[in-house]
Amino acid sequence: MFKKPVKTALAALSLTLLLSSCGGGSLPNYEYEIDMKPYKNALTVTDQAYRILVNKENPCGADYAPESLSAIPSELTLYGKSVQMESTAALAAEALVRELHARGYTDIVVTSGYRDYAYQQVLFNTYLGNEQAKHPDWTTEQCRAEVLTYSALPGESEHQTGLCMDLISTGNVTLDVTFADNPAYAWLVDNAHNFGFILRYPEGEEGTTGYSYEPWHYRFVGVDAATKIYKKGITLEEYVK
């Protein structure tokens, strides 16, 4: 799944996935609107590698990357742009967005998936520049601390794993908390786990996840783990303890 994990634990998890990448479970008791045959094996993976924890305390290195990337179909991405994810996660993401569309939430598309280390560095620096322009009386460290509440340093972003995606509405192409006002959000909160995804940064869990609330950010962990996380109302950090 991944080319060069930095930490030994991550390397072991990656090897587990390479040895067994086929789905090993059953689909949940949920009435899917779409044909799930093309997606079942992706959703039901049980490999621990899909539960890799990447955050401020568990960084990965500059050369850490998915071994296999697949593109999300362009009709499911914002403006048809190229968005890639780890191949199994990409299939699960496709299933989730197609289900959203089948249920009438046709404005929801994927705007971001895999990001490499270098891209995250550019993104972080851009945010830092924005904060410095917004707060000219702040020190660089103050601006940096502000950015760290909503953006990861390169190596600390789980976007680098290829296992997460950012969703957006074509009617409001700004990634902010107003995504929670979209009717699709309530459906996602209650049903994303049926496609192996969790809301990665829930409201009120900043102290646990290290990041502010992101109603648009969904992480693939497989149906089994996602369902347990959903039912317990916990974060990925709490689940992998």
Predicted regions and their residues:
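Sec-dependent N-terminal signal peptides of Gram-positive bacterial secreted proteins and lipoproteins
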Residues: 2-26
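Extracytoplasmic cell-surface/polysaccharide-interacting catalytic and binding patches
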Residues: 2, 22-241
